[in-house]
């Protein structure tokens, strides 16, 4: 079984804007710059035949490139936050890409969670730690901070290996997104 997800890699110019904010977080396990991504679909643990079917399905998609704008810090996890995230401004192109990727994964026989798509980039994981006043202060200070924008020209199928010191993401395949007019 392979733990996998489909996501958009965050480019270096955006991670450079996020790192100073990550450095100010007083607690939590910081996500390293090379792991920063926007998840389009979490597959969970899937067997090789399903993973190959997902790859084939994603290879057949030809959605348009999408604009991604990161803005503001927030929590995810409800009353007991489990992560600090940079928000991603929703847009129709990103929603269409999300739906296309979900459709390809479901057509491959993978059961994916049915939850509302809230695009974000995880900056730190809190685990079982309770949020501190200092952490709350950092999040509130950056609630509306713009972190830049980029045009996503592709998405990637990743393998996720969980390790004691954090997850390691390995790209398995990349799928180009169509530029306008192609």
Could you say what each language-model-derived stretch is?
Residues 1-182:
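Histidine-dependent nucleotide/RNA phosphoesterase domain, centered on the 2H-phosphoesterase fold
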